[in-house]
């Protein structure tokens, strides 16, 4: 830049610069309305929606498009869990279906390779979607240098790129949170990011954390014959789910040989050449657990550091970027969506936030999200799905409610599948019959929830669900039956 004169030209009320933190060269052909930092489910969806609304959009991503969900989380785990379902059926229930599987061989590496092919296909799909909507993709790490200006440090030795836009959206996601004093080595002591890539299952494993990640990996490895112990500091696994749902899943896990230690905070973990012994606190003192490896599945920490937010005065709390219902921060022109806000760290919630944010930027008409009533899903075996209030939460708020529960074992399709453990529970306002919550545990529970969340959003009474004719035989009939139970009486119970 030496010897050059910095030029500045007004372009549609925005300034765009290239190269350097303090100096730049005007790039008249790249004015942006919106720049999104991060191309995960929140970021890339926000960019696409912004482009659909007529904005010139760009994303900055330092890793793979699709974020953690697509590359290391939601998608590859679901691919592996499909393999786990097949393995479980053949090894524990093959005789019921008439299969003789005495010499069955299972290739875990093949399952992992299959999952990576699916990831590659979907990453390419995101790339094509962004290209289709004329969204520019800049590779590298971004810093918000000032409101309206982003500096991108490329991964190679090329000069930094300075971009400008009226609106900057932070969608940088979150990373695994490890307990204090524990540093994963990626081998004996590891997180989901390492676990999802390794082509050999653990010889034995202790999973610290009984939330969605811990339960899904427990389901996977148990199906491949790995001895699994789940260590949860709270009184029950799946602690954010309805108490009865947690109990049903725990019962199923124990039946399959998974050891559950709940109410057992980890006191110490020692990494050795031969394994990773743990000491956990129990009512009677301490207990020692021997495991070949330890998976840390204790939650997430927002990726809000190193973005320049502190210098700009963006309000944060324990790393979470605080936003209002429009996804706006306290600094005009800076927005935040997805896991980095700490609202509800789920991919589909991030995508919904991204759409709402883009619509609010474009016209101020974006949806206001009721996070408590958004769907939650856990793809363990059995699956869990829920939204809204549990019975205990409703009682704590002084709400008068009615509940109905219908079992999958009274459903013809579930019996035909041979997967009939579990039930659906609906919670409704006692006076108006308005749906306040639903909790499902059982086969394909995660696929059944949208009908119920739509009914809630539309303000429909449970009677409308009961009167909605469901195809027979389908698993979804359990929803209709439970709704009948709330509005006049069960038909098949």
Region roles according to the model:
Residues 24-32, 48-55, 60-201, 229, ...:
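Glycine-rich flavin
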Residues 16, 21, 136-139, 143-156, ...:
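A Rossmann-like FAD-binding core segment of flavoenzymes
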Residues 186-201, 288-363:
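FAD-site-proximal beta/loop scaffold in flavoenzymes
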Residues 74, 172-227, 231, 310-312, ...:
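Glycine-rich dinucleotide-binding loop and its adjacent helix/turn
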């Amino acid at each position: 830049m030496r010897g050059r004169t910095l030029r500045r030209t007004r372009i549609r009320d925005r300034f765009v610069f290239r190269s350097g933190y303090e100096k730049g060269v005007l790039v008249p052909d790249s004015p942006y309305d919106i720049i999104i930092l991060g191309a995960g489910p929140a970021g890339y969806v926000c960019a696409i929606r912004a482009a659909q609304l007529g904005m010139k959009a760009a994303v900055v991503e330092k890793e793979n498009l699709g974020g953690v969900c697509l590359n290391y989380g939601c998608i590859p785990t679901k691919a592996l869990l499909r393999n786990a379902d097949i393995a479980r059926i053949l090894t524990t229930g093959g005789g019921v279906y008439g299969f003789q599987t005495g010499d069955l061989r299972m290739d875990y590496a093949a399952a992992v390779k299959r999952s990576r092919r699916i990831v590659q296909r979907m990453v390419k799909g995101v790339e094509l979607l962004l290209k289709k909507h004329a969204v520019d993709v800049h590779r590298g790490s971004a810093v918000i240098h000032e409101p309206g200006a982003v500096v991108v440090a490329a991964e190679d030795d090329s000069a930094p790129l300075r971009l400008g836009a009226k609106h900057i959206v932070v969608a940088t996601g979150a990373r695994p949170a490890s307990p204090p004093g524990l540093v994963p080595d990626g081998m004996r002591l590891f997180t989901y990011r390492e676990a999802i890539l390794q082509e050999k299952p653990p010889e034995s494993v202790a999973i610290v954390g009984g939330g969605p990640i811990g339960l899904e990996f427990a389901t996977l490895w148990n199906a491949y014959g790995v001895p699994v112990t789940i260590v949860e500091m709270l009184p029950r696994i799946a602690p954010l789910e309805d108490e009865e749902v947690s109990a049903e899943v725990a019962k199923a896990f124990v039946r399959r040989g998974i050891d559950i230690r709940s109410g057992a905070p980890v006191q110490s973990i020692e990494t050795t050449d031969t394994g990773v012994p743990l000491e956990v606190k129990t009512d009677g003192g301490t207990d020692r657990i021997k495991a070949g490896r330890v998976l840390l599945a204790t939650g997430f920490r927002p990726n809000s550091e190193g973005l320049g937010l502190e210098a700009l005065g963006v309000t944060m709390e324990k790393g979470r970027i605080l936003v209002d219902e429009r996804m706006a921060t306290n600094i005009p022109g800076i927005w935040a969506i997805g896991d980095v806000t700490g609202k509800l760290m789920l991919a589909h919630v991030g995508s919904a936030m991204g759409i709402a944010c883009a619509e609010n930027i474009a016209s101020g008409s974006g949806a206001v999200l009721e996070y408590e009533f958004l769907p939650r899903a856990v793809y363990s075996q059995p699956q869990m799905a829920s939204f809204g209030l549990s019975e205990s939460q409703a009682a704590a708020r002084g709400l008068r409610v009615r509940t109905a529960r219908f079992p999958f074992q009274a459903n013809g399709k579930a019996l035909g599948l041979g997967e009939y453990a579990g039930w659906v529970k609906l919670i409704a306002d006692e006076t108006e019959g308005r749906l306040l919550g639903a909790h499902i545990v059982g086969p394909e529970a995660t696929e059944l929830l949208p009908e119920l969340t739509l009914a809630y959003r539309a303000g429909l009474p449970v009677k409308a669900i009961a009167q909605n004719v469901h195809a027979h035989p389908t698993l979804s009939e359990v929803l209709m039956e439970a709704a009948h139970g709330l509005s006049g009486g069960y038909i098949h119970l």
